[in-house]
Swiss-Prot record:
CDD domains: UBCc_UBE2D. Pathway: Protein modification; protein ubiquitination. It is an enzyme of class 2 (transferase). This is Ubiquitin-conjugating enzyme E2-16 kDa. Belongs to the ubiquitin-conjugating enzyme family.
Length: 147
């Protein structure tokens, strides 16, 4: 079941790739993908290329994939291990969702962080109280790690 669904998503991604994102298997292992997200132009991540690892569980799509950033990023919802705090990767997962939709949600989170459900409270605090400082640090990290 999982393999059939993963293959279908791979075909769909090739046919209709989401803008500014790409994803595909690492080598022959269809359960382990690498994805790239281009930093959205209307965000402090503009110009950056961010890599993510995607691991599909054997009971996919009934359980969500594990997705994490392998490129360092300064963001209130992404920690230093690359873990992502995003509801659709946890309790709001639905088998109707696809990797394409997950990547688009992550892209939108880069533009609009959710400081009220942070994985890194310190960054969320800076985001809420000193937005210019947050954007400056995020741009600096993008230059340092994603370009």
């Amino acid at each position: 079941m999982a393999l059939k669904r993963i293959n279908k998503e791979l075909t769909d991604l090739g046919r209709d790739p989401p803008s500014s994102c790409s994803a595909g298997p690492v080598g022959e292992d269809l359960f382990h993908w690498q994805a790239t997200i281009m930093g959205p132009s209307d965000s402090p991540y503009a110009g950056g290329v961010f890599f993510l690892a995607i691991h599909f569980p054997t009971d996919y799509p009934f359980k969500p994939p594990k997705v994490n950033f392998t490129t360092r990023i300064y963001h209130p919802n992404i920690n230093s291990n690359g873990s992502i705090c995003l509801d659709i990767l946890r309790d709001q997962w639905s088998p109707a969702l696809t990797i394409s939709k997950v990547l688009l949600s992550i892209c939108s989170m880069l533009t609009d962080p959710n400081p009220d459900d942070p994985l890194v409270p310190e960054i969320a605090h800076v985001y809420k109280t000193a937005r210019a400082q947050y954007e400056s640090t995020a741009r600096e990290w993008t230059r340092k790690y994603a370009i």
